[in-house]
From Swiss-Prot:
Encoding gene, per UniProt annotation: dmxR4
Region (Disordered): 1-61, 534-564
Compositionally biased intervals (Basic and acidic residues): 47-57, 539-564
Assigned GO CC terms: plasma membrane
Biased composition (Polar residues): 25-44
GO terms, molecular function: transmembrane transporter activity
Signal peptide: none
Location(s), subcellular: Membrane
Protein name (database record): MFS-type transporter dmxR4
Record-linked InterPro entries: MFS, MFS_dom, MFS_trans_sf
Glycosylation sites per record: 222, 469
Amino acid sequence: MSSERPDGSAVGDAVPKDTAVGGATDSSRTSNDASQTSQDTAVQETPPKEAPAKEAPAKPASELTQSKWKIALLLGLILMSMFLVALDRSILATAIPRITDEFDSAGDIGWYGSAYLLTCCSFQLLYGKVYTFFDIKTVFVANLLLFEVASAICGAAPSSTVLIVGRALAGIGAAGIFAGTIIAMVFLIPLRHRPKIQGLFGAVFGITSISGPLIGGGFTTNVTWRWCFYINLPIGGVALIAIALWMEVPNKPTANLPLAEKIRGLDLLGTAVFIPCIICLLLALQWGGTTYAWSSGRIIALLVVFSVTFVVYAALQAFRPKTSTIPPLYFLPLWFQTVKGVSAAESGVHLLPVMISMIVGSVTGGFFNAKVGYYSPLAVTGSTIMTIGAALIYTFKVDTSTGRWIGSLILYGIGLGWSFQAPNLAVQTSLAKKDVPSALALIMFVGLLAQAVFVSVGDNVFDTQAARNLSWIPGFTASELTSSGAVSFLTALSPSQRVEAIEDYNSALRKVFMIGLVLCAVCVPGLASMEWKSVKSRGSWDEKPAAKPTDKPTEEKKVPPEAV
């Protein structure tokens, strides 16, 4: 309510202008008796046109301290860094055959991807803590520099072993860049605008999924596979220098903590237990049933170590809560190449419907969430559509028409683009500011871990099911299929055998698609059960609530310190 003065003006009509723009100032925190005289004077001296009936929403600190052009430039540089990391995940696929020919290292093929994924996944949670206690710009620039050095090592690698080491280092840097891009956005962009930006992040991954294999194939064919890594140097160098010079991130409450206290907060003991835990799990899933039998001593030992370290890590998180840290697109090219008989390049073209629709869904979903505010409706709708698309993919047969598989992929891509933003927006809207870095790191870790686990599970399911289906071929052995590759194995068969073998391949791949369908279906109730909150909600921790003309000056004192 506003109190009336002798001249008819209301106290609440003049004061909120300053408090809405500047936040809760020191003067607004003084007692009413001490500030009454100055407020009366301000009311009398303010012309009527200076006291609008409705004030604009308060701007967060990031909009006051940096211009829109500078924030746009910084976002472009951050997106460039994310582009490099995303490109690094897709550009290598077409270069691997040439790499193995040069190094005579067919047995190391799995390590070129696994070394990167193991370190990227294992260090994800640690970086959530690092960004909580240390300067965001310093950590981000350091990881970008590490990624650049690792790319140079990979490009100049004289042997397969050096290349694997370089990939492992690149994974560590990529983990820091993954976490840093989202966390930097939290401090640069107001919550109500973040859905649009996260839509751009999704578009970056979609673009690199399309361009990565094409760029890698072009370098490998026309220049050398080493340029798949060298390309990171000039692009990343520009981003690194510009971010180091221009990025400004507000100080966090933990900035002034002693170094020893920051290190204690990193949960180094938990990390030391967690990293071997995840490595043992991923190695067991990658090797089990393919390189080694599930009953072999190595696989059993890996699973035992994983189980023990997981229990220890869970105990550490439970008893030390103050420091605790807690696949259709992969197999579709194989379906196109084996069942539909297209080339590797053509299979990449056939993925365009799902990639383009995912980009469109991501961008449109971002703008929709920013406009409406509530992210849950689109998340539930998107996950439902994604599940329908996954169900249609599961029904693929040898004679599935072009229109049907294109429509199925479009549905899957649209649903994926609409729903993938929800977890990131949920933690930014619901959690306290100090908890957001760890929560975002946890989300990214779970995504990377799920990718590693279920791709390995899918590999095992396909190899096992295909070997069982093809056992009718005279002299066939499972090792023959894994050593020669699915496509090469088909070409070695007679025409009559090939027709039946293609049916067997399709049956095996449908088992893999069933895994994706189940995972998509599980997402629907999970997203539907999330608390409905709006990114425009009043009192978001990084934006001060808009002042209303009827607010009393004393009500501005109720703004919590963490909202400033």
